[in-house]
Amino acid sequence: MSKSLAGLAVLAALFIAVDAFRPSGLTNGHATFYGGSDASGTMGGACGYGDLYSAGYGTMTAALSTALFNDGASCGECYRITCDHAADSRWCLKGASVVITATNFCPPNFALPNNNGGWCNPPLKHFDMAQPAWEKIGIYRGGIVPVVFQRVSCYKKGGVRFRINGRDYFELVNIQNVGGAGSIKSVSIKGSKTGWLAMSRNWGANWQSNAYLDGQALSFSITTTDGATRVFLNVVPSSWSFGQIYSSNVQF
């Protein structure tokens, strides 16, 4: 095989094609906001992304209610949220919509009724949005507005990122800045001295391996929830250390 054909074969192995992510239908819900005018209170969160600025999410984010969060499997998904002006002309900005990324969980509050403070109680479909995102669709004093939403494709700048946490025999990898479907179905990891090893979701967007991979270059194979797969060969160098973030040039 010629070098050019071999190169094409490697490239094809990195991208397993599926149909482009297709937006969902429209669904009704409600939205509130949190985190302050600069969204500083939204950092961290139940997906484990940490600093949402450095992770690529900025202020266009939201915490999802139980009905949407799916025990963390929805981390990274993108939603277009439109304020339902027909249902609330007082507090909705007419025709306004915004695309957010799911980065956190809005826990239920069973001490309060669903229609008066228990906004994130099951089975409600609710977005607790970063304040800057919410103010693109609603008037601040309204506090809560009815919305129409749909899941849409995520468009991210740069490649997928990997933050390596944990300790020896326990690699906890937070996978960030995922485009396309945004949410992840499965992950495998490969050290330069191992074969491919399946990882398991620990919590949020954190995936774990119990292999000893110190001193090895790390590769990942990620399949998103729409079935698209990308392979990130040697994206983490053998000199890696816990607590560091490593960026790829590959995106969905």
From Swiss-Prot:
One of its GO terms (cellular component) is membrane. SUPFAM superfamilies: Barwin-like endoglucanases, PHL pollen allergen. PROSITE patterns: EXPANSIN_CBD, EXPANSIN_EG45. It holds the Pfam family DPBB_1. SMART domains: DPBB_1. It is found in: Secreted, Cell wall; Membrane. GO terms for biological process: anatomical structure morphogenesis; plant-type cell wall loosening. Expressed in the leaf, but not in the epidermis or in the vascular bundles. InterPro entries: Expan_Lol_pI (IPR007118), Expansin (IPR002963), Expansin/allergen_DPBB_dom (IPR007112), Expansin_CBD (IPR007117), Expansin_CBD_sf (IPR036749), RlpA-like_DPBB (IPR009009), RlpA-like_sf (IPR036908). Residues 1-20 form the signal peptide. Keywords: Cell wall, Cell wall biogenesis/degradation, Membrane, Secreted, Signal. It is a peripheral membrane protein. Residues 169-248 form the Expansin-like CBD domain. Residues 44-159 form the Expansin-like EG45 domain. Causes loosening and extension of plant cell walls by disrupting non-covalent bonding between cellulose microfibrils and matrix glucans. No enzymatic activity has been found. Belongs to the expansin family. Expansin A subfamily. This is Expansin-A11. It comes from Arabidopsis thaliana (Mouse-ear cress). The gene is EXPA11.
